[in-house]
Curated annotation (Swiss-Prot):
InterPro entries: DNA_mismatch_repair_MutS (IPR005748), DNA_mismatch_repair_MutS-lik_N (IPR007695), DNA_mismatch_repair_MutS/MSH (IPR017261), DNA_mismatch_repair_MutS_C (IPR000432), DNA_mismatch_repair_MutS_clamp (IPR007861), DNA_mismatch_repair_MutS_core (IPR007696), DNA_mismatch_repair_MutS_N (IPR016151), DNA_mismatch_repair_MutS_sf (IPR036187). The keyword Nucleotide-binding applies. Gene3D superfamilies: 1.10.1420.10, DNA repair protein MutS, domain I, MutS, connector domain, P-loop containing nucleotide triphosphate hydrolases. Belongs to the DNA mismatch repair MutS family. The lineage of its organism: Bacteria, Bacillati, Bacillota, Bacilli, Lactobacillales. This is DNA mismatch repair protein MutS. CDD domains: ABC_MutS1 (cd03284). It comes from Streptococcus agalactiae serotype V (strain ATCC BAA-611 / 2603 V/R). The gene is mutS. Keywords: ATP-binding, DNA damage, DNA repair, DNA-binding, Nucleotide-binding. GO terms for molecular function: ATP binding; ATP-dependent DNA damage sensor activity; damaged DNA binding; mismatched DNA binding. One of its GO terms (biological process) is mismatch repair.
Length: 858
């Protein structure tokens, strides 16, 4: 049987596809991007496009699917959003001039981590992460946002830190520079749903790589660079020099902690609404929005940097009218970072340059407004603002205000910018008049009253003559086309004018394109200055945003202390307050003196324990961002980390139960926390048997108290734990107050000193709407259980009353009354001392001394 032959075009496709086996290959053929073989079958299903075949009559037709080139971006977006790579093969020569098969090559590979263009633009960062290791114990991690040029690297000492940083960066694609174990591969691909791309080669760019980085950081950064250049197929002038950062330079929080605190999105809805980001976002620019997210994600630990931000916010609060002018001016600023990156990618169109020009037109006014504050705190910012008047002049002089996005259809360069272009336009403009003159002249000479000149791409300019007037056609007319009811004619004069006009049009279009490319190249030389300007404007935008929020919600400037004390007077949970309204929210004060490390919080479910704990965390985060906070007065230490376990949730992806997740997060806290950390644990230990959970909860509290010394809030439903305050000197009990009247319970949402006396679980069930008969039965059972408990504690048998102390203890154990806490280690000695006292020969003074000595033993 003869081997089926493959056409040269399909052979070209197969040769290119061989180099991109892990990507969908979009193969440009005329006005379509075609996909073949398995790519076509899969793409047709995913994109819901028609699946056809090439060579339908062949024994084995080749599956084929295609999308129009002008709408391809929306299909690329769908594939990339689902985690696929897309290789784009373009025609590299004019098909009309090609000899043989049109030359094609891949010009870009779009991956989840390298998206620059999208039909659904998003102001958020899109980070591509690279990791490398020599011993799988220490790791270099580098990340980049290809759309903005941001490039950073750090060194991490364990894989859990790598995992946490990847989650915090919300990366979707990881470039791996070493051989992963099966376990780590499964973790990244299956549990974290990441696209992995392996890269062995390194690209050393002396302009981007800082030699002061560690070897692993350099390796990760260079492999990341190599991957980006290999997929983007071009020099990227907008990439910034890699910046080293340390995790410890910021307030450390795990992804789970940020999620439980609803920092960047509401954990229940995965939406912005209801998050801290939603509350604080009064930014007016895309760069400011990204920077605000970064500030929330990475609060500071440097007191000086925090105070620098506070000082500027205070200035913005003190000068309302100037700040209002500043806010209005920021509205006219486009996304400088991404416009600069589009220039670097060679994708910037006339509209992009117009937006950049309009932005640069606003910068002098923004600088002038900042100067008008006349405050030294703003001097550094003012001095950083580079107005670049020559670039603004170039763009606004060269690009026509009405220019569209396309760069090949003309009308993009302003009149007066280029003399030759103006000449071509004059020919085209006057040519229209010349044609009108020819039409009038020939109509009069021929006597054909309906004679007119029309135009189409096939025949060019022609005289339109109906059949009834064919006898009047002059001899110098020559036929160009015959139709059913008319004919088309040309003349030498018309052809000459047409030639001049078409040449002028073609030359004009080509010249406009060349001029635009030259202008864009000049803009590219300003990219680094534009990026610095973007950072400065973003900083101004975030600071004014925090000032606006502080003013709207009456926030105060927090103070900081070195005495490890927390003082929050009438604090509020910032986002809950915004949802409920200031008038409805019940504030709570929080106090930890230098001798208090742990608050043990008891109270009914739904009474506000979790809100109280989150209130403290959000106050710390907002304060260490440099912002103002929701309270009447705040004085805090600077924390180095926040650890939380708030809210129950199984980890369904990895198959871990609530209790396992609790223990893992507790492990992270007790191992990584320092005496400068904040720990928030809500109902820890509820996922196992009562005594197991209680024992673990107590041991964790003791461990934190004795060894970690971190400021800790520990909410619990184990009321027995409140007795710990008698043993642990730096633990205090607080509870959520309730009002019980006529069988009805009101949660006051107010924190008070001391332990709670009841849990009110049945009342919560009533609020939830459980059936009345079920609740009545629960009340009866509770009464019986409480009666039994009282009997065990206060009504021992008559025999036990008359027995000695040791027999009484044994009797309690036999009845099932377990002691949660160990008996004091001196109990036996106290008993011995009591038994040794001769009561009949004891003077009053000796009795007092004996009591004093016994008290010291307790």
């Amino acid at each position: 049987m003869a081997k089926p032959t493959i056409s040269p075009g399909m052979q070209q496709y197969l040769d290119i596809k061989e180099n991109y086996p892990d990507a969908f290959l979009l193969f440009r053929m005329g006005d379509f991007y075609e996909l073949f073989y398995d790519d076509a079958v899969k793409a047709a299903q995913i994109l819901e496009i028609s699946l056809t075949s090439r060579n339908k009559n062949a024994e084995k037709p080749i599956p084929m699917a295609g999308v129009p080139y002008h709408s391809a971006q929306q299909y690329i977006d769908v594939l990339v959003e689902l985690g696929y790579k897309v290789a784009i093969a373009e025609q590299m020569e004019d098909p009309k001039k090609a000899v043989g098969v049109v030359k094609r090559e891949v010009v870009q590979v779009v991956t989840p981590g390298t998206v620059v263009e999208s039909t659904k633009p998003d102001s958020a960062n899109n980070f591509l992460v690279a990791i490398d290791s020599q011993d799988q114990q220490t790791f270099g991690l580098a990340y980049m946002d290809v759309s903005t040029g941001e490039f950073q690297a750090t060194l991490l000492t364990d894989f859990e830190s790598v995992r946490s940083e990847i989650l915090n960066l919300k990366a979707r694609e990881i470039v791996v520079g070493y051989q992963l174990t099966d376990e780590k591969n499964h973790l990244l691909t299956k549990q974290m749903n990441l696209l992995l791309s392996y890269e062995d080669e390194r690209l050393n760019d002396i302009h981007l790589i800082d030699e002061q980085l560690t070897d692993l950081e350099i390796s990760a950064a260079e492999k990341l660079l190599q991957y980006v250049h290999r997929t983007q197929k071009r020099e990227l002038s907008h990439l910034q020099k890699v910046v080293h950062y340390e995790i410890k330079d910021y307030l450390q929080m795990s992804y789970a902690t940020k999620n439980s605190l609803d920092l960047l999105e509401n954990a229940r809805t995965s939406k912005k609404h209801g998050s801290l980001y939603w509350l604080l976002d009064e930014t007016k620019t895309a760069m400011g929005t990204r920077m605000l997210r970064t500030w929330i994600d990475r609060p500071l630990v440097s007191m000086n940097r925090i105070k620098e931000r506070q000082d500027i916010i205070q200035v913005f609060l003190d000068y309302f009218f100037e700040r209002n002018d500043l806010t209005e001016s920021l509205k006219g600023v486009y996304d400088i970072e991404r416009l600069a990156s589009r220039v670097s990618f060679g994708k910037a169109n006339p509209k992009d340059l117009l937006q950049l020009g309009q932005t640069l037109s606003q910068i002098p006014r923004i600088k002038m407004i900042l100067q008008s504050f006349n405050q030294p705190e703003l001097d550094i910012i003012v001095n950083k603002i580079d107005t670049m008047p020559e670039l603004e002049s170039l763009i606004n002089t060269a690009i026509a205000p009405e220019a569209q996005a396309t760069i090949t259809e003309g009308n993009i360069i302003k009149s007066g910018f280029d003399k030759q272009l103006d000449n071509y336009r004059t020919v085209m403009r006057e040519g229209t008049g010349w044609i009108a003159d020819i039409e009038a002249k020939e109509r009069a000479a021929s006597g054909i009253g309906t004679l007119k000149i029309d135009y189409n791409k096939k025949d060019g300019y022609y005289f339109h003559v109906t059949n009834s007037n064919l006898s009047l056609v002059p001899e110098h007319f020559f036929r160009k086309a015959t139709l059913k009811n008319s004919e088309r004619y040309g003349t030498a004069e018309l052809a000459k004018i047409e030639g001049e006009m078409l040449e002028a049009r073609e030359q004009s279009s080509n010249l406009e394109y060349d001029i635009f490319m030259r202008v864009r190249a000049q803009v590219e030389s300003y990219i680094k200055r534009l990026q610095e300007l973007a950072k400065t404007i973003a900083t101004v935008d975030v600071l004014q945003s925090l000032a606006v929020v502080a003013e709207n919600y009456h926030y105060v400037r927090p103070k900081f202390n070195d005495q490890h004390q927390i003082k929050i007077k009438n604090g509020r949970h910032a986002t809950v307050e915004k949802v409920m309204g200031v008038q409805e929210y019940i504030p709570n004060s929080i106090y930890f003196d230098s001798q208090t490390d742990i608050q043990l919080i008891t109270g009914p479910n739904m009474s506000g324990k979790s809100t109280y704990m989150r209130q403290l965390a959000l106050t710390v985060i907002m304060a260490q961002m440099g912002g103002f906070v929701s309270a009447d007065e705040v004085d805090l230490p600077v924390f180095d980390a926040i650890f939380t376990r708030i809210g129950a949730a199984d980890d369904l992806i990895s198959g871990q139960s609530t209790f396992m997740v609790e223990m893992m997060e507790a492990n992270q806290a007790v191992k990584r926390a320092s005496d400068k950390s904040l720990i928030l644990f809500d109902e820890l230990g509820r996922g196992t048997a009562t005594y197991d959970g209680m024992a673990l909860a107590q041991s964790i509290i003791e461990y934190i108290h004795d060894r970690v010394r971190a400021k800790t809030m520990f909410a619990t439903h184990y009321h027995e734990l409140t007795d710990l305050s008698e043993q642990l000197t730096r633990l205090v009990n607080v509870h959520v107050a309730t009002l019980e009247r006529d069988g009805e319970v009101t949660f006051l949402h107010k924190i008070e000193s001391g332990p709670a006396d009841k849990s009110y679980g049945i009342h919560v069930a009533k609020i939830a709407g459980l059936p009345i008969d079920l609740l009545d039965r629960a009340t009866d059972i509770l009464s019986q259980l409480e009666a039994d408990a009282v009997q065990l504690i206060v009504s021992p048998s008559q025999e036990a009353v008359t027995a000695d102390l040791n027999e009484e203890l044994d009797s309690e154990k036999q009845q099932g009354q377990l002691s949660l806490f160990e008996e004091p280690s001196n109990a036996g000695r106290v008993i011995e001392e009591l038994e040794a006292i001769d009561i009949m020969n004891l003077t009053p003074m000796q009795a007092m001394n004996a009591i004093f000595d016994l008290k010291k033993l307790l």
